[in-house]
Amino acid sequence: MASWNSIPLEISYEIVGWIAFASWSISFYPQLILNFRRRSVVGLNFDFVMLNLTKHSSYMIYNVCLYFSPVIQKQYFDTYGDKEMIPVAANDVAFSIHAVVMTAVTLFQIFIYERGPQKVSRLAIGIVVVVWGFAAICFFIALPTHSWLWLISIFNSIQVFMTCVKYIPQAKMNFTRKSTVGWSIGNILLDFTGGLANYLQMVIQSIDQNSWKNFYGNMGKTLLSLISIFFDILFMFQHYVLYPEKKVSKSPETGEESNEPLIDSSHEHV
């Protein structure tokens, strides 16, 4: 297993990593606090929360397994070389566990607070069922040969796919309502900061090791930040340019705005 060549770079790696952890972790709280203060989740898309829970759960499985399992680490070194470093840091593990818990809390708020006519769409439910069904099939494929690195790579790919999909319902809802009221911009600003810090952390490791294998050795982490940053910019454009709050004429507590999920209401499912 490789070790750090530069102590300053190692320290910088840890600092930047925990900045990413703090930014991403704190990003969950503005939405939770907003929901709590309003006693309402009107404006928050339920499909987003449902898909986000699957995304973070799959990311947690990947991080925890690769970080703690000597067997999977050996398979990683056999694949990418024993001079490479494991592309998962302690802050990645801490963040993914925290993310699952906070997303579950947000889901709980949906059940207890005023939510208007919105429901989770059948399409979102279908995506979640298919994804976990696919993961179960992959588990039984990996079991006979103990191909655990391949299996957790599947979970890593799942979280990338879910990252691509999960933002679409919220972006569509903002466009339909011509408003971002009820959707916390604080979440987006912190998520954007975390994405940039995450990339910087990977660059620091690559410079120290004189190798860029950690980018494609953990393609999920690489694509995660890229996709998140893209949608963060889109949401900031919606919030500050297209639909600034001063243009909103209806109070979100009334629940009168359109709250469409990923598909038309005619296809909604309880």
Curated annotation (Swiss-Prot):
The chain crosses the membrane at residues 14-34, 93-113, 123-143, 148-168, 180-200, 223-243. It is found in: Lysosome membrane. GO terms for molecular function: L-amino acid transmembrane transporter activity. Keywords: Glycoprotein, Lysosome, Membrane, Repeat, Transmembrane, Transmembrane helix, Transport. It is a multi-pass membrane protein. Residues 9-75, 151-213 form the PQ-loop domain. Disulfide bonds: none annotated. Residues 250-270 are annotated as: Disordered. One of its GO terms (biological process) is L-cystine transport. It holds the Pfam family PQ-loop. One of its GO terms (cellular component) is plant-type vacuole. InterPro entries: LC_transporter, PQ-loop_rpt. SMART domains: CTNS. Glycans are attached at residues 52, 174. PANTHER family: CYSTINOSIN (PTHR13131:SF5). Belongs to the cystinosin (TC 2.A.43.1) family. Thought to transport cystine out of lysosomes. NCBIfam families: 2A43. This is Cystinosin homolog. It comes from Arabidopsis thaliana (Mouse-ear cress).
